[in-house]
Structures are given as structure tokens and as C-alpha cells.
């Protein structure tokens, strides 16, 4: 038996979210085919073209989000809570396309979501300078965006960096997580993990994905397992701060 679910639920379990009753540590993780690399982008009409201008802005940037538990909302809350960026989060949109349309219509200044889809949604607006990518909320700098600063580098303390990693970066990395049933024999688990990884690195598979404009940016089952374990090892004080930042206010 195999399953795929939104890895953000793992953080939800750590935070004690109602309705998330399964112990995520009991699942066996096969891997992730593509990680989300979250960035924040703003329309030029916002008057903010880079993160330094954002820090200095007396007007909060109006960002669109879907709902709590979705990266569009959670990342906005996390960068506001850890970096102190002025943000007004507007939630209730049904998808990132709705957010894009609202930003293009002037209802929003911008949003934070996966670069893998944001660069397609604004494929003309970004090169034209109508939309500026101002922040990367990622574990490492994206090759496409060498001059865009990372949130981790702007954080002023180890605690802020840990909060960003646990509340924004790790959930995005494991958002499409493949699992199998608990307590399967270790030998079988290793076979499944190797097959999963082999598929995602197969030259023909990668070539077909590229033709279809599908990004392949995998994590192994072992890497996912470590990420999950790290989330469950967070201290009660950090979990409390995460819950406070991500709470609807």
C-alpha cells in the first residue's frame, strides 16, 4: 500500500492540529519527487522592488493566501513573525491563479508560493519588470535567482533561522511526500526507496518530465525521514513559538 499526502500535515501534527491523529513517525517514507522552493514576489505597483525597501516600507505589503496550513499563508506568517517584514495577509483565495489575478488587478501587492509554479504564472511579468521576486524562503539559493536574498541569511538569530526552517522551509520541501505502511520489513523498505529514487533519476523519465515542463527535485526516503524526525524533536518552547506565529490573529 502506498500513499501521498501534503507534508504540511506533519507540522500540523507536531503543533497539535485538530483532526491530524496519525503518528507520522510510524509511517515509512519513500521520498519526495519535487520539493517546493518558496519565494515572495511583489508587483511593481507596490513601490517595493527589493527586500530592503520592504523592510523600510511604512505600508504593509498585502499578500494573498489560501488558508492556514497552506504555504501561501504559512510562509507569509513565518517571514512576518521571524524577520519583522510588514505584511497584511489576505486569505480565502481558492488557488495561486486567483492570487495572481488579484495581484494583477491591484487587489494585492503580491504573494509567496513555489518558484516552480510562480515563474510560470508570471512568465512574462517577471522579465518585463512588472513583478519582482524579492525573497527566497529556501534552504539554499536557487540557481535562477542568484541575486535574490534568502530569508535564512536575513534572520538575526539561530532561533529565528530554526523557526523559518521548521515553519516554512521543511514543510515546503516535503509537501508531496510518498509513504508506505508502518512496520514493513526493512529489506522491502530499502527496495522500495531505491526504486523510487531510481525512477526519479532515470534519464528517460527526467527527459520526459523536462519536455512537459515538470520540475524534478527529489528527496530520498532517508532525507524525508530525517526531516520528519527533526520536526518532532523541536523543543516545547520552539513548538509554542511556531504555533503562536502560525495562529490566525
Language model segments and positions:
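Hinge/capping helix and adjacent helix->loop/strand transition within the periplasmic-binding protein
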Residues: 1, 7-98, 102-105, 155-163, ...
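Short beta-strand and adjacent tight-turn residues that come in two discontinuous sequence segments
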Residues: 4-5, 92, 112-114, 136, ...
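Ligand-binding "clamshell"
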Residues: 14-28, 85-87, 120-136, 144-161, ...
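Short helices/loops that flank or line small-molecule/ion binding pockets
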Residues: 78, 82, 97-111, 116, ...
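Residue-level detector of anion-binding/catalytic polar loops
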Residues: 86, 109, 215
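An extracytoplasmic/periplasmic, membrane-proximal ligand-sensing/linker region
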Residues: 129-130, 134, 154-156, 183-249
Amino acid at each position: 500500500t502506498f500513499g501521498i499526502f501534503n507534508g504540511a500535515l506533519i507540522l500540523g501534527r507536531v503543533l497539535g492540529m485538530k483532526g491530524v491523529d496519525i503518528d507520522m513517525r510510524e509511517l515509512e517514507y519513500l521520498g519526495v519527487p519535487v520539493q517546493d522552493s518558496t519565494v515572495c514576489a511583489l508587483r511593481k505597483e507596490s513601490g517595493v522592488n527589493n527586500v530592503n525597501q520592504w523592510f523600510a516600507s511604512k505600508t504593509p505589503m498585502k499578500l494573498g493566501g489560501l488558508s492556514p496550513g497552506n504555504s501561501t499563508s504559512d510562509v507569509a506568517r513565518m517571514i512576518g513573525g521571524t524577520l519583522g517584514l510588514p505584511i497584511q495577509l489576505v486569505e480565502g483565495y481558492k488557488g495561486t491563479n486567483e492570487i495572481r489575478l488579484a495581484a494583477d488587478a491591484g487587489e494585492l501587492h503580491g504573494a509567496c508560493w513555489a518558484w516552480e509554479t510562480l515563474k510560470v504564472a508570471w512568465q512574462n511579468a517577471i522579465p518585463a519588470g512588472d513583478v519582482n521576486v524579492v525573497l527566497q524562503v529556501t534552504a539554499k539559493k536557487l540557481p535562477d535567482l542568484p541575486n535574490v536574498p534568502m530569508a535564512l541569511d536575513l534572520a538575526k538569530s539561530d532561533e529565528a533561522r530554526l523557526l523559518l526552517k521548521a515553519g516554512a522551509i521543511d514543510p515546503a520541501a516535503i509537501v508531496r511526500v510518498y509513504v508506505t505502511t508502518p512496520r514493513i520489513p526493512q529489506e522491502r523498505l530499502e527496495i522500495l526507496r531505491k526504486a523510487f529514487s531510481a525512477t526519479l533519476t532515470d534519464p528517460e523519465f527526467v527527459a520526459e518530465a523536462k519536455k512537459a515542463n515538470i520540475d524534478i527535485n527529489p528527496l530520498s526516503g532517508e532525507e524525508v525521514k530525517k526531516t520528519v524526525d527533526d520536526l518532532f524533536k523541536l523543543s516545547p518552547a520552539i513548538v509554542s513559538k511556531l504555533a503562536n506565529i502560525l495562529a490566525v490573529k
